């Protein structure tokens, strides 16, 4: 037997002790582990990006982006936020890009018949079947929020919860349609999409975020594809949601909108049409039209409570914000009593306790 030799191993990168650096490393590892799939559906090819691996007895977190952007532009800031690493490691995450909206997509020829939002909602079953996801928690923004709501109305048994940011469940009325036509005579498609994404104050202030997204839309080779998705959004049908009626979302729902955002009134109206025992309403101050981009920390905390209320991540560490946030229920219906947000995370195996209405 040959003589054993002593080998000294020097660690080039010592273990990280800084939590922030550890979170950054985890985020980088997740990026390395990303998997992309192109999935054929009856309404075109959708590209999905997977982070992590499916967890037994846990739903997948599935996202759907708004108009004028792909999943990276819409969700990267939120999912790369350090505290989101804690959530991502507990679930598999699937980002759906609407047909023709992802970076590197081919430009559609003139006259291409783009799917309606109702048809885009029917691409989700194809994605879930392809990836073998039995149930999901959906996170949608703008058009993506509408698509998830529409999907859930037809496939409620596969949806455990929804986070709907900037949702407008109503069809455009004749006055809205006429105003849109007149606006189209004086504004470019990029200006109209920016007016949908950001508040008037944000646009006039021309913040770094606004400048970044304005440049991204203006310089995109996919601007004609963006317009097709935009046209489908503006042609959406009324979801006809009704509190206590036959058409409603029966799973836990967290509605999110920025204070003074373009869609604030629409989200408030949507809140009035949903079951108050299943619905949380988060109005975020200083977040503008895209709270998942401008206030990822606050949204992450709210989302942690949301999934804890569903019985997941019961042992997760809460930051000072989540421990101390005080909320009061809406005065509508039975939502007149007050409580702190921490009470909503005490749910065990019983029905999910809704978050309270919060302004933060």
Curated annotation (Swiss-Prot):
Any Pfam family: Ndr
Entry-linked InterPro entries: AB_hydrolase_fold, NDRG
Function: Contributes to the regulation of the Wnt signaling pathway. Down-regulates CTNNB1-mediated transcriptional activation of target genes. May be involved in neuron differentiation.
TM helices/strands, residue ranges: none
A single GO BP: cell differentiation
Organism placement in taxonomy: Eukaryota, Metazoa, Chordata, Craniata, Vertebrata
Similarity remark: Belongs to the NDRG family.
Signal sequence residues: none
Main location: cytoplasm
The protein's name: Protein NDRG2
